[in-house]
Amino acid sequence: DDSILIVCSEVAPILEYITGIKIPLPYVNKSWTILDQTPWKDITRITAGKMYINGSPMVDIDSIHNWITSPIHTNINEAYEDFRHIWNSVTKTMTPACQAGLTYSGGLDSSIILSHIDDLELYTINNIGKDPIIDCIEDFLTNTEKTKLNVFSINEIEWATEYNQMLSRIYMPASSWSFVGQWIVNKNCKQRVLFTGVGADELFGGYDLYKDLKFNTSGSVSPYSQFGPTELWNKCLSSYNGHAGQATMLMDYWHQVTGVDARGIDLIAGAWGIEPRNPFLAKPIMQLALNLPFEFKVNTVSKPLIRRAFLERWDKSLILPKKGFTGHANDSLPYMNCKFDSTGDRMEDWKIIAQKSFYDCKHN
């Protein structure tokens, strides 16, 4: 019935009511993930912070751009004290009465969640041969925490199996190869609540490349958002009064967090009946991060405020390079349900994998 409007947090249930017809979408970097149109005919995304009337966005309620004001911190020590106070409050408020889990990598972000929330079950993915930090993961943990550590070691064949299983359940392309790690964690999580550290890199300056980018007001120069819509770039630039560095990080937030990671975590956790929680995406933390001076985010070290919080418990020697949920995306190609000749470029190959595997997938 054309008069019926279905609103749902994922695609799969909608396809129980309509005939699913896949339509082609442009795979240019990750920009397609913030388009209103989904890869399914007549299924569109709604925009957060807007009131919809008769299926169309009519009234602005709130926006992340409204949270940006002039920086209030003039020195980094003052900024850190505010961060520490807000972080303590947010993590305390977010701690559930029931048992909870944490996606733990040994990195700065998940570590400062671990240090502020007690009795978490820990879930770690070891993409064999990809993540050297996993080999010393127990160095980060107390004896009690070690008893709560669950490590899932995944090879190329297993990665491909999990990828295909995930794709046939979520009914959407995998916007990032990190989705498979999240899928495995949620699949094995025995708690009703699972914490993650998504968003910290984009909000607090976690990408090393930020230190070397030649920021330009003409558009984002970040590889994560350089193909983003001009209208969105202009809005980000305006929100920061023409500061190209701040605008670029906000563009990355829109693409990487709103478009990919946060949406993927919500979708995958929901598939397993789990509630994801993330202190970094709590409004008080986001407001602080969005209004930090640029040099308090992009400095001689990455994420200086989060790094400082990490060093309150752990030694500097444990700040190690990591690749997170890198996965075996390209290495698993021989075992996946899509065949093509490699381009020789891993990122280009991944785009083809993500697109072809979705359009070729026979959803169950």
Task: Provide a role label for each language-model segment.
Residues 1-165, 169, 192, 308, ...:
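Cysteine-centered catalytic environments shared across enzyme families
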Residues 42-43, 178, 195, 219-364:
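Adenosyl-5′-phosphate
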Residues 73-84, 171-175, 247, 251, ...:
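Short acidic-aromatic active-site loops that bind/stabilize oxyanions
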Residues 111-115, 183-187, 287:
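Short, hydrophobic alpha-helix immediately C-terminal to the catalytic nucleophile
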Residues 128-184, 204-219, 242-243, 291-298:
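ATP-dependent adenylate-handling ligase core
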Residues 187-190, 197:
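Active-site nucleotide-sugar/metal-binding loop of Leloir-type enzymes
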Residues 194-207:
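Short acidic/histidine-rich active-site segments
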